[in-house]
Amino acid sequence: MREFMHYVTNAFYGATGWNDDNTYKELNVTARELIDFPLPRGLRLTLSSLATPHFATSYQLGSVGIVDGSISYLHSSVPLTGIAARSDRIPLPALLRSYRRLHDLGSKDQQQYVGAEHAPTESTPPAVAKVDGSSLLYGRLYLPQSLLEGMVVRRFTPALQVQLSAVSERSLRNGGTLLGLVQYDKRKYGVEGLASTDGGLLGVRGLYNFGGDASSSAMNPPSGTSASETNGSGPSVEKERIYGRFSAGAELYYGTLNKSGGMSLGARFATLPAHRGTPLTATLTINPLMGNINATYAVLAREYCSLATKMEFNVYSYESEWAVGVELWSNRRPAGFLLGANPNDQAEPAPEPPRKSNERSFQAKMEWRLDDPEPEPQSPVAGEKSADDGPKEEYKGVLKARFDQNFRFGLLWEGRVKSLIFSLGTGRSD
């Protein structure tokens, strides 16, 4: 489950038109969330609130052997008025869905975490802050460890963003660490430069897109045709086939204090929202220095079913590993879901009330008259809504499962009861 502060942070990116998917670090995010999802440890309660459109708070209390907790604050210079902040109104896919479909490069004002249908929801803020100078401040204090972490995000231009993250704790070298990120996004490609005080780390990573909506014809539509008309996706004939975007990238980093470095190469193919077939994502990453090869494949088989598989191989030791993951959504409670209920089944309609017989009532017989005619049912007036016409919840929960070759498994059920969003999980990791 994504934390509330993560949800608000992505709402800030959506409101400012920043594409967080166009980075190398998010190359394999879909398979990672479907297979390597974290399991809850102990009992943990979180209370969060978007107090104002600019300010959010979160308080967490947990018990894992000892009682601990945290206090978080977030401030956004952009008013986040378009997101659902109440836990009974937040669309569950915005917090729980693992499969992430890429959105078009030409429309940066979409929510980063969206469902498979890509329909606008309450959680999708309008892109009202496509101006320079947007900023976000975040701080979190962990108790009783007295560990403090903070983050500052500053938008200088529509294509340039700087992020500073810091952690302060006594056990760390020099009492803390500082990480700086400079992100440059030109839709066709994205470049990041990073520097950290932990080991004097310096690095650079980049991602280049081609094909699909990143092609020259889609990025520069002919005169008289706007990008919204084509949805940034080119001719409709291409959508009948497997229509997606190829991305290739690499990262290179070096530790100036320990005199060690590393690098990796990666490629991804993912279908776009305009694709009319089954959504899928395939990635391949290679670490030449360590000899590791990692391949993943994820598919959204149905609106309520996502599947993923991962294969790792080392060319030096000939060791290999594999793992699979599945995500099943349900609009029923856990009991009905485990008994094999179809998530798309609808409730049976209520039986029609029996019709009254034509026989007169006793009172009408005593007064030598017919019964009064029954009032005709009034049709609702246009524009009026009944009490049952409110927003209907599409899903009530999701079951996530993973399994690997060493018989390690994980089971996680996440859902909502009234205003409480919960996670229950178990697994074997030995």
UniProtKB/Swiss-Prot annotation:
Transmembrane segments: none annotated. Keywords: Membrane, Mitochondrion, Mitochondrion outer membrane, Transmembrane, Transmembrane beta strand. GO terms for biological process: establishment of mitochondrion localization; mitochondrial genome maintenance; mitochondrial outer membrane translocase complex assembly; mitochondrion-endoplasmic reticulum membrane tethering; phospholipid transport; protein insertion into mitochondrial outer membrane. It is a multi-pass membrane protein. Component of the ERMES/MDM complex, which serves as a molecular tether to connect the endoplasmic reticulum and mitochondria. Components of this complex are involved in the control of mitochondrial shape and protein biogenesis and may function in phospholipid exchange. MDM10 is involved in the late assembly steps of the general translocase of the mitochondrial outer membrane (TOM complex). Functions in the TOM40-specific route of the assembly of outer membrane beta-barrel proteins, including the association of TOM40 with the receptor TOM22 and small TOM proteins. Lacks alpha-helical transmembrane segments, suggesting that it resides in the membrane via beta-sheet conformations similar to those predicted for other outer membrane proteins and porin. Component of the ER-mitochondria encounter structure (ERMES) or MDM complex, composed of MMM1, MDM10, MDM12 and MDM34. Associates with the mitochondrial outer membrane sorting assembly machinery SAM(core) complex. This is Mitochondrial distribution and morphology protein 10. It comes from Chaetomium globosum (strain ATCC 6205 / CBS 148.51 / DSM 1962 / NBRC 6347 / NRRL 1970). The lineage of its organism: Eukaryota, Fungi, Dikarya, Ascomycota, Pezizomycotina.
